[in-house]
Amino acid sequence: MPRPIQATIDLQALRHNLAQMKSAAPDALVWAVVKANAYGHGLERVLQGLRAADGLALLDLADAERVRQLGWRGPILLLEGAFETRDLEWCSRLNLWHVVHCEAQIDMLAVHKTHQAHRVFLKMNTGMNRLGFTPQAFRAAWTRLNALPQVDEISLMSHFSDADGDKGISAAMAIFQEFTHDLSGERSLCNSAAVLRHAKDAKVRVDWVRPGIALYGSSPDYPAHSPAHWALKPVMSLNAAIIAVQHLQVGDTVGYGSAFVADRPMRIGVVACGYADGYPRHAPTGTPVCVDGVRSRTVGRVSMDMITVDITDLPHADRGSEVTLWGLPTKTSMPSAGVSIDEVASAAGTVGYELMSALAARVPVTVLDSP
């Protein structure tokens, strides 16, 4: 019998979230971001749920080739652009758009011999200080690209560093507009947080938006807003079963380091999921779970293959009971709305992005899709 743990990918939830992004940024085209193997969900698994996207944005040439082989004929954008000159031949062969964020990438284009001119997104650094030309160097980069016969179309982009917080996007927007107002080309600025919080403004959403984490049902500005606030549905759920029950007396301890001490008689469920499955090792006592659809909590430290949960006040919970680590229970008859991955991530001092992308290969995955 397989170990009783399972991840579920819900394509209807993915379609719903994509529709929410389109509604939040009316008239804009959508790059669905599928980097990091679609945030841990699996490129092959999610592609059918993203057919309504206008383009796919990712990092790796190998991933671009995979989605072409899977039948995607729409635009594909390489978010970090080319790393070597020979990558440009792949871009031509696979008909890829690619980001240009430094002079070295323009140098590569200038010496590249191609029969098909390239479509590029020229990136400005408006304060994130990761990739992109400084505002002062941006026009010279655009002018140089515009003079190359290897380049057919230049679009303009940046990435907001504070769209999810109080600082907001106004300073970055002002910089971008000041240095691009008379340059031709489509624009792309908005990540998930900017789409949900700011994209009703046509000057912000411009031509293309690039939602990532929100597509998969996580709130980009948690804890300020929950996924439910943005009407997002969890795409990934992680469920496992209780494989043993322990009865504790006052003073008994649980797990490595005796980190949890019972202050009353307790029943503890041992769950077939640990940090080797992708559950966060640093999740403390009190991290929320659902047991047979009823909210409870973890107790003690997370082990490699197991976690322990409090079932003292759940008299029907026993060996075989389903524990929802994040997302929704597998049985729709269960009473709970589940556990947001953002709640678990916040308790563990991380973000939903990390939990999704860290799902271990040993966890079996089931794809749900309604006709």
What do the PLM-derived regions correspond to, one by one?
Residues 1-97, 152, 364-371:
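A charged N-terminal "starter" segment
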Residues 14, 67, 156, 242, ...:
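Residue-level signal for inorganic ion chemistry
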Residues 80, 153, 242, 298-299:
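A structural signal for short, hydrophobic beta-strand segments that form beta-sheets
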Residues 247-371:
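C-terminal accessory subdomain/extension
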